Amino acid sequence: MSRNIRNVLNMSDLPPQPNFSYELDLQNQGFFHIAGVDEVGRGPLAGPVVTAAVILSKDHSLDGLNDSKKLSVQKRNRLYCEILQSALAISIASICARAIDQSDIRKATLEAMRRCVMGLAVPAHYALIDGRDIPPHLPCPAKALVKGDQRSVSIAAASIVAKVTRDRMMEHAGQVYQGYGLEKHVGYATVAHRAAIAEYGPVIGLHRYSFALIKRYKEDIS
């Protein structure tokens, strides 16, 4: 039997907010260091995909953990600081736009997830992965949880770390590549971003040339 489990769950069984039940169940089985793993940035036209792995202690006092997309910027930033201070271990990995183009976004995301689990200072005994896919060659058993950032506090913590990290990277990119509004839309295909690409063209190393929308703009310029 495979030690990796893909857990496709009914969306109607989502808890009101993420909880520690998956982690406690695994700890009762002898897996004490549970890493929650999540990604941010699969869909944007520009910038990296960023992943984070977070191991929380079971007596953590983080209040209001949830899927990063459901939090205000202020609350997300507060929780980000609290996670950095209280987590047993945190690891972050990113794959740049060029590398995404050389592979594909799914493979790049899984590779970034693998790297951040491998990079944990406290080795994970088990990994809870947000989504349907489990990265290959992990150093520990793993389970994939659909909507995991709404089920597991460890995955929710990872989603916050990945989101804040990527947003800050894109804010910096906005200072370097002015005129694209990256600090506002962080690379997503907003009307303003598409208009800027149409006017200035895509940027090598920033935009994902393997994405259909960028390909179309490139062909129009050519």
Swiss-Prot record:
Manganese as UniProt keyword: yes
Q: Which SUPFAM superfamilies match?
A: Ribonuclease H-like
Catalytic activity, as annotated? Endonucleolytic cleavage to 5'-phosphomonoester
Its EC number(s): 3.1.26.4
Task: List this protein's GO terms for biological process.
Answer: DNA replication, removal of RNA primer; mismatch repair
Read off the HAMAP family from this record: RNase_HII_B (MF_00052_B)
Q: This chain belongs to which protein, by name? A: Ribonuclease HII
Give the species this sequence originates from.
Answer: Bartonella bacilliformis (strain ATCC 35685 / KC583 / Herrer 020/F12,63)
